[in-house]
Each structure stands twice: as C-alpha cells, then as structure tokens.
Regions:
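N-terminal targeting sequences that direct proteins away from the cytosol to non-cytosolic compartments
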Residues: 1-167
Length: 167
C-alpha cells in the first residue's frame, strides 16, 4: 500500500509520471551511501513494540538537508488501514519537503538573466533556476529555458490587457 502510494502518478499531467522515485532496500542493506539520500522512509513492523501506527520525522539524521520519516506499526494491516485513512499523506509530505528545498535553493542561487529582464520589462521579480540562460524578450512576453537535452525546463511570462472578469 505504501509503495503504490509513493509511486502514484502526479495529478493533472497529460501523461503518467510518478510523484516520487522510489528505491526499496531491506533493512540489512540500508548502509553506506543509501543513508545519505535526501528523503528516507523507514517502516518498522513490530507487534511487541507498537499497538498502533505512529508517524514522525527527523531532519539531518545522516546528511544535511535530509528528512527521515519513521512509520511504525504493530502489523501490515494497520499500515494498510493508515494508508486508506491518510491517503496521499506521505506523498504530500515528501512533495512539500522537495518544494521547500527548491525554494531555499532558488533564494540562494537564481538566474540573473530572468530576474533582470522580468524586473525591468514587466515589474516582476522571479527566481528561476540559475541554469536558465537562454531567453527571448519582447514587449509583454518573456521566454527562458535551460535548453538541456534531458530535464529541459522552460518558463513563459506574458501580459495582456484586463478587460473584464472573463479575460
């Protein structure tokens, strides 16, 4: 139940894309470099230690910027029930963590090309990724891209006159 929740598709996209990339390892194999990944979910099932599901998280356990979520339960049935009653809770949590991480990074390092052009032309301040170096700037329209062969990202900002609430 948890694996399928974490691998669920991002809603609203024209094609299916998973919300998160998941790597599953047995507890005995969770060593070395695996401990330094950004987001970790540790599931512990122990009927002698737990009577109900508990969820918590810690920051920076093995690496800076890391979030480790602990999901503890007495049995697999209680985890399935938790997944049903808290649908998308784990996905939403990890997505929010990643969004906050991206915001923090964009506050430190961003494209001055995008910032300067949008500020001067459209009076908009926008922190786009620093690798957005390609751009086209015309009256009321701005396009920028990282122009990458893989992982390409584009940004379009434009204005048009407001005429009524249906504009």
């Amino acid at each position: 139940a948890i694996k399928s929740e974490l691998a669920s598709s991002v809603p609203g996209l024209p094609q299916a894309e998973p919300s998160l990339k998941i790597t599953y390892v047995q507890p005995k194999d969770f060593t070395g470099l695996l401990r330094y990944v950004r987001n970790i979910l540790v599931v512990t099932i122990d009927p002698t230690a737990y009577t109900k599901v508990s969820v918590g998280y810690e920051n920076n356990v093995w690496a800076r910027g890391q979030v480790v979520v602990s999901l503890k339960a007495p049995n697999t049935e209680s985890i399935v029930e938790y997944s049903k009653t808290h649908e998308k809770a784990l996905v939403n949590f990890f997505v929010k963590v990643e969004m906050n991480r991206a915001i923090e990074q964009l506050q430190k390092e961003y494209s001055m090309v995008v910032m300067d052009n949008l500020k001067s032309d459209l009076n908009v301040m926008l922190n786009a990724p620093a690798n957005f170096t390609y751009y086209k700037d015309t009256t009321d329209f701005f396009w920028s891209s990282n122009n990458a062969n893989t992982g390409r990202m584009d940004l379009i900002v434009y204005t048009f006159p407001y005429t009524d609430p249906n504009t």
